[in-house]
Amino acid sequence: MAAKLKKGDKVVVLTGKDKGKQGEISAVFPKENKAVVDGINIAIRHQRQTQTSQGGRVAKAMPIDLSNLALLDKNGKATRVGFREEDGKKVRFAKTTGDVI
Protein backbone atom coordinates (compact mmCIF):
# COMPACT_ATOMS: atom_id res chain seq x y z
CA MET A 1 0.00 0.00 0.00
CA ALA A 2 1.25 3.49 -0.83
CA ALA A 3 2.15 5.90 1.95
CA LYS A 4 -0.50 8.48 2.73
CA LEU A 5 1.93 10.72 4.63
CA LYS A 6 5.41 11.41 3.28
CA LYS A 7 8.53 13.35 4.22
CA GLY A 8 7.98 17.08 3.79
CA ASP A 9 4.19 16.99 4.36
CA LYS A 10 2.67 19.61 6.67
CA VAL A 11 0.66 17.82 9.39
CA VAL A 12 -1.33 18.52 12.56
CA VAL A 13 -1.32 16.33 15.68
CA LEU A 14 -4.78 14.91 16.50
CA THR A 15 -4.21 13.42 19.97
CA GLY A 16 -1.74 13.43 22.84
CA LYS A 17 0.23 16.09 24.68
CA ASP A 18 0.99 17.99 21.45
CA LYS A 19 -2.64 18.01 20.21
CA GLY A 20 -3.30 20.86 17.76
CA LYS A 21 0.37 21.59 17.04
CA GLN A 22 1.52 21.74 13.43
CA GLY A 23 4.82 20.73 11.89
CA GLU A 24 6.59 19.19 8.93
CA ILE A 25 7.47 15.51 8.67
CA SER A 26 11.25 15.03 8.67
CA ALA A 27 11.34 11.20 8.59
CA VAL A 28 8.88 8.33 8.10
CA PHE A 29 9.27 4.75 9.35
CA PRO A 30 6.70 2.67 7.38
CA LYS A 31 7.46 -0.66 9.10
CA GLU A 32 6.89 0.90 12.53
CA ASN A 33 3.97 3.03 11.26
CA LYS A 34 5.58 6.14 12.81
CA ALA A 35 6.96 9.50 11.72
CA VAL A 36 9.21 12.19 13.18
CA VAL A 37 7.70 15.69 13.05
CA ASP A 38 9.87 18.77 13.64
CA GLY A 39 9.12 20.35 17.02
CA ILE A 40 6.59 17.67 18.06
CA ASN A 41 6.94 14.94 20.73
CA ILE A 42 10.18 16.39 22.12
CA ALA A 43 12.07 14.28 24.69
CA ILE A 44 15.27 15.00 26.61
CA ARG A 45 18.08 12.57 25.86
CA HIS A 46 21.34 12.43 27.82
CA GLN A 47 24.32 12.42 25.48
CA ARG A 48 27.80 11.29 26.46
CA GLN A 49 30.64 13.68 25.69
CA THR A 50 32.91 12.72 22.79
CA GLN A 51 35.88 14.34 21.08
CA THR A 52 33.61 15.89 18.45
CA SER A 53 30.49 16.76 20.44
CA GLN A 54 29.78 18.17 23.84
CA GLY A 55 27.81 16.02 26.26
CA GLY A 56 24.72 16.98 28.21
CA ARG A 57 20.96 16.99 27.87
CA VAL A 58 19.77 17.18 24.27
CA ALA A 59 16.18 17.82 23.14
CA LYS A 60 15.22 15.37 20.40
CA ALA A 61 12.02 14.88 18.37
CA MET A 62 10.78 11.32 18.91
CA PRO A 63 8.62 9.29 16.50
CA ILE A 64 4.84 9.66 16.72
CA ASP A 65 2.27 7.19 15.41
CA LEU A 66 0.89 7.99 11.94
CA SER A 67 -2.67 7.48 13.20
CA ASN A 68 -2.21 10.54 15.44
CA LEU A 69 -1.36 12.80 12.47
CA ALA A 70 -3.52 14.42 9.79
CA LEU A 71 -2.38 16.17 6.63
CA LEU A 72 -3.03 19.91 6.31
CA ASP A 73 -4.71 21.00 3.07
CA LYS A 74 -4.02 24.32 1.32
CA ASN A 75 -6.60 26.03 3.58
CA GLY A 76 -4.77 24.88 6.73
CA LYS A 77 -7.45 22.36 7.76
CA ALA A 78 -6.88 18.71 8.68
CA THR A 79 -7.85 16.35 5.87
CA ARG A 80 -7.82 12.69 5.03
CA VAL A 81 -5.78 11.44 2.08
CA GLY A 82 -7.12 9.47 -0.85
CA PHE A 83 -5.64 7.99 -4.03
CA ARG A 84 -6.82 8.24 -7.62
CA GLU A 85 -5.38 7.82 -11.10
CA GLU A 86 -4.60 10.83 -13.25
CA ASP A 87 -2.97 10.38 -16.67
CA GLY A 88 -2.09 6.80 -15.77
CA LYS A 89 -0.33 7.79 -12.55
CA LYS A 90 -1.46 7.14 -8.99
CA VAL A 91 -1.67 10.46 -7.11
CA ARG A 92 -2.60 11.52 -3.58
CA PHE A 93 -5.43 13.99 -3.07
CA ALA A 94 -6.98 15.85 -0.14
CA LYS A 95 -10.48 14.54 0.57
CA THR A 96 -11.74 17.92 1.87
CA THR A 97 -10.88 19.92 -1.26
CA GLY A 98 -10.22 17.24 -3.87
CA ASP A 99 -6.90 18.89 -4.79
CA VAL A 100 -3.88 16.81 -5.75
CA ILE A 101 -1.15 16.92 -3.12
Swiss-Prot record:
InterPro entries per record: KOW, Rib_uL2_dom2, Ribosomal_uL24, Ribosomal_uL24_CS, Ribosomal_uL24_KOW, Translation_prot_SH3-like_sf
Secretion signal, residue range per the UniProt entry: none
Key words, A-Z: Ribonucleoprotein, Ribosomal protein, RNA-binding, rRNA-binding
CDD domains per the UniProt record, alphabetical: KOW_RPL26 (cd06089)
Gene3D superfamilies: 2.30.30.30
PROSITE patterns per record: RIBOSOMAL_L24
GO molecular function: rRNA binding; structural constituent of ribosome
Biological processes, Gene Ontology terms: translation
Pfam families: KOW (PF00467), ribosomal_L24 (PF17136)
Any one of the GO CC terms: ribosome
Protein function: One of two assembly initiator proteins, it binds directly to the 5'-end of the 23S rRNA, where it nucleates assembly of the 50S subunit.
Family named by the database record: Belongs to the universal ribosomal protein uL24 family.
Subunit composition and interactions: Part of the 50S ribosomal subunit.
Protein name: Large ribosomal subunit protein uL24
Gene encoding the protein: rplX
